[in-house]
Amino acid sequence: MENKENQKSISRRNFLKTSVVLGGVASLAAVTGKVFASSAVAQGFSTKEKFDTIIANGMVYTGEIKAPVKADIGIRNGKITAIAKLGKNCDNWVDATDRVVCPGFIDIHGHTDTNLLEAPLGDSKIHQGITTDIGGNCGYSPFPFSDEEYERRKNTLRFGYPFWQNIDGFYDALRKNTIGINYGSYVGHGDIRHIVVGDNDVAATPEQLKMMCKILDKQLEMGAVGLSFGLEYTPGSYGRTEEFIALLKVVAKHDALYAIHMRNEDDRVEEAIAEAIELARRSGARLEISHLKAQNQNNWHKVPSMLKLIHDAEKSGMDIHFDRYPYTAFSTGLDCFIPLAQRQGSSKEILARLENPATEKIIREYALGRVKRLGGPECILIAACFAPGNEKYTGKYLNECCKISGKDEWETIKYLLQSEKLNVNMAGFAMKEDNLRTLLNDPLAMVITDGSVYSPKGRLGQEAPHPRSYGSFTNYIGKYVRDQKFCDLQTAISKCTSVPAHQLKLKDRGLLKEGYCADVLVINYDTIADVATYGQPHQFSKGIDHVFVNGVHTLKNGEYTGCKLAGVII
């Protein structure tokens, strides 16, 4: 199955010896080193000012879709204070000759959340160049909690820290722990609905809806970047249109972002896009469609019509974008093989339905049908099991798991769900490579991981995450931009930096510009690559030579410097 994702990049000639196409015109900067004018780059020499760091002699990509320039970058007090020819008047001089220098990458759709307390450096993300990470996606966030749940859990320790109730408590825990990357979070609609309405398929009453809006307003006031929906999951899928619109009007009031994991990403994907757009139209909220895809072979032809729906909305004046990770396999929970109607209620209630002959028959038929639509058991990877004795299933495809268990496909799925109390991670290989290229190359697209922070060490190193958690951005730049040349480097970098910064309303990140926060990468364009695989995911990317987070030299020659972690809450 590894051949479905060729993640090894082929070495190329130094990027300075190749031309970069911009607007159909070859940029001579890559060939001659000629300095081009840019609105973000000053010209001339500056040797009087002393800097904390000078990144010298690199090809500077500002994050704008403009030709690169050969220049130095001066950093002082965590900010970019000069972009020019600067000499060596500094405490830390970094030679970036033959290297790309660009803004730190912004992962607008991640699931890092509480993992950042276990791996505060942000190991798997910072090694692929991510300096800002946005969590709380797909309708789930590590907050808020009801008064009752907070009282029940506040005296327990979570990763060694007191429990929190709202976003401000979670942010405080991150600050006290210190973090190596910048972090912000959506608030999950599913969590709000769970608190107020519960986990069953019922409409919110007017009073409940008023309470949901009040909770959302509070989280946004405390710093949430927006509201995320996970309409393929419970309990978010049980919300009604009126509920969504009322909540999104609160989002629009704050000029925050509305992100949606749509109700369907396969047979009814076009209808799901239309629903997402209609909710944005009726509420006035800015829309981010999460990990846009067409799953299963019988839906691969739908990508052009999907994009037409999105671009028609954008042409009508709607603020709409989408994001995507550069892999043809998705990642989710094994409970996706249970139909939504059977996922109501608590885990105990759901597990009981696996024992009831009538409901088990319904679930079995749905599960086997979905296995077939995904391409068979050889297209389903069990990414993480946690129960003692189940380690042998981690990293194995479903057909391999069947051989280990001595059971058929359904009985193996059922056993894993029961023994793991529904908590099983999986990956499904259900997407087409050509569609992936089309989506990534769209002007409204941004690059994401859709993954969490991991580390090869400790508990997190025992899991088998999707390789995107270690290599989405390096895979995109190395495989698709350098090797396959489907867009110029400045456009690619903008999708990873300035475009998500604009969507998040970040006023001082996403560009290399005087006065901006010094989140800066030095990249070896010849070697940048994702080396993580589905079988061996815990491998750091190659080619990210240096990473600066708020001016602090966090990675040097690809290794953690031991510095005090400098990430902030955005």
Language-model segment annotations:
Residues 356, 438-444, 449-450, 454, ...:
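C-terminal cap of metal-dependent C-N hydrolases
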Residues 52, 61-72, 424-430, 435-436, ...:
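Acidic, glycine-enriched loop/beta-strand segments at the rims
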Residues 174, 179-182, 186-206, 212-233, ...:
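Active-site neighborhoods of metal-dependent hydrolases
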Residues 12-28:
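N-terminal export leaders
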Residues 1-14, 38-39:
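N-terminal secretory signal peptides
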Residues 221-276:
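Divalent metal-binding pocket/active-site signature
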